[in-house]
């Protein structure tokens, strides 16, 4: 990770350099053989919180716009939204990172559907961030037995989807867990290191959640089901996990992959993995998380996850053109998966910029996940808007 940039210097950098970046032009190589229904998606889960904290967004003419409408105008056709169970502590203090409780996620879902885009709902089954290194149970489920957890995840999924359906925003696709390499609802649903039977228990939880989802559907295929792993270049991980899950008959339609070249390696390795797993399991594949920095500069006091080191490792320059090239090449790799199994790409958090008070986690949130780090946004230089909310030309890669 790169050295911290002091806050005053970071602000001066953002005020000086980043508006110029919004005026840069980019050259985008056309996609080959892109299907008309190819998913050009974005995860905008932090948007409502960012707006509540004072951020506004501008188009290329510096006209204030609704960023959802601007994404749609530039070709984005599918939106991913995460959902946490109760992202607040006992005193009601929010955890940050978007504050993605049911009310927040429903409000965003209504904007998505009103704009004419499709919706992917990402169940984390936790009160805050989940990934391969952490899968904390919701506070309300902390003392439940395994059998009780199966009931809880079934009922929660059923009731949540029923609410979305009632509000007229039934998702088009649902993700059962987020980056579940290590399983979910630890320790009962952990996929390793629990003395045996790990995948039996994990499959039981997944099946319970899927059954809850399907209670709201007119047919099993009405809403696509995705299972999602991180580290999209690691074929051995995907084979290990999905071999075990398919042995146990867990029903799903799509394999989701996270892909950050600066952590995971080149797109060519992702492509090889997608080619293999799409045929091995006879499933569609979607890159459901991906992002790249348009600058190594920083806009706040939190060290960014993308800096000079990541730019050197990521395979593309840390420029607006480099960002656009990354997204274009990633989409092409998915399109090129054999037998038309590659269905799309979701860009992660293109609208996550840095209004005052914005943070990946508050102190309350850090306490919940037991991860204490500097307050602030570590991702703003991978957005598709600069830190003043001006859209970057790289957004045109979705057209």
Task: Pin down the residues of each PLM region.
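Glycoside hydrolase catalytic-domain groove-lining segments
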Residues: 61, 65-68, 200, 214-225, ...
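Aromatic-rich peripheral "rim/lid" segments of glycoside hydrolase catalytic domains that contact
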Residues: 26, 30, 272, 276-279, ...
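N-terminal carbohydrate-binding accessory modules
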Residues: 22-76
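Bacterial N-terminal signal peptides
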Residues: 8-16
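Acidic-and-aromatic substrate-binding clefts and catalytic sites of carbohydrate-active enzymes
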Residues: 50-51, 55-62, 87-90, 95-103, ...
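Substrate-binding cleft and catalytic face of glycoside hydrolase catalytic domains
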Residues: 70-225, 230
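Active-site beta-loop-alpha junctions enriched in small/polar residues
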Residues: 44-47, 84-86, 124-128, 176-181, ...
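Conserved, mostly hydrophobic/aromatic
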Residues: 42, 71, 122, 174, ...
């Amino acid at each position: 990770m790169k050295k911290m940039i002091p806050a005053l210097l970071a602000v001066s950098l953002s005020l000086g350099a980043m508006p110029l970046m919004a005026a840069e032009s980019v050259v985008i190589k056309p996609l080959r053989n892109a299907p008309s229904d190819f998913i050009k998606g974005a995860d905008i889960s932090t948007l409502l919180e960012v707006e509540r904290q004072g951020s506004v967004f501008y188009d290329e003419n510096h006209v204030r716009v609704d960023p959802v409408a601007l994404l749609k105008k530039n070709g984005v056709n599918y939106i991913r939204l995460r959902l946490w169970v109760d992202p607040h502590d006992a005193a009601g203090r929010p955890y940050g990172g978007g504050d993605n409780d049911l009310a927040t996620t429903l409000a965003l879902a209504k904007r998505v559907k009103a704009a004419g885009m499709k919706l992917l709902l990402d169940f984390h089954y936790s009160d805050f961030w989940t990934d391969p290194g952490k899968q904390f149970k919701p506070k309300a489920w902390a003392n439940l037995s395994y059998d009780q957890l199966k009931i809880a995840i079934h009922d929660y999924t059923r009731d949540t989807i029923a609410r979305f359906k009632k509000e007229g925003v039934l998702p088009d696709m649902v993700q059962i867990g987020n980056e579940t390499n290590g399983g979910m609802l630890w320790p009962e649903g952990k996929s390793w290191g629990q003395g045996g039977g790990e995948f039996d228990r994990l499959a039981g939880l997944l099946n319970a959640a899927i059954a809850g989802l399907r209670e709201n559907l007119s047919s099993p295929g009405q809403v696509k089901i995705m299972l999602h792993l991180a580290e999209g270049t690691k074929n051995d991980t995907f084979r290990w996990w999905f071999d075990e899950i398919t042995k146990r008959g867990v029903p799903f339609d799509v394999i989701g992959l996270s892909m950050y070249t600066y952590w995971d390696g080149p797109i060519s390795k992702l492509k090889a993995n997608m080619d293999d797993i799409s045929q091995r399991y006879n499933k569609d594949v979607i890159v459901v998380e991906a992002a790249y920095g348009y600058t190594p500069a920083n806009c706040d006091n939190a060290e960014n996850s993308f800096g000079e080191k990541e730019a050197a490792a990521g395979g593309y320059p840390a420029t607006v053109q480099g960002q656009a090239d990354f997204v274009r090449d990633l989409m092409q790799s998915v399109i090129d998966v054999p037998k038309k199994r590659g269905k799309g790409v979701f860009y992660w958090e293109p609208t996550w910029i840095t209004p005052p008070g914005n943070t990946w986690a508050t102190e309350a949130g850090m306490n919940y996940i037991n991860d204490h780090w500097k307050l602030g946004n570590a991702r703003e230089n991978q957005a598709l808007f600069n830190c003043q909310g001006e859209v970057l030309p790289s957004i045109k890669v979705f057209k």
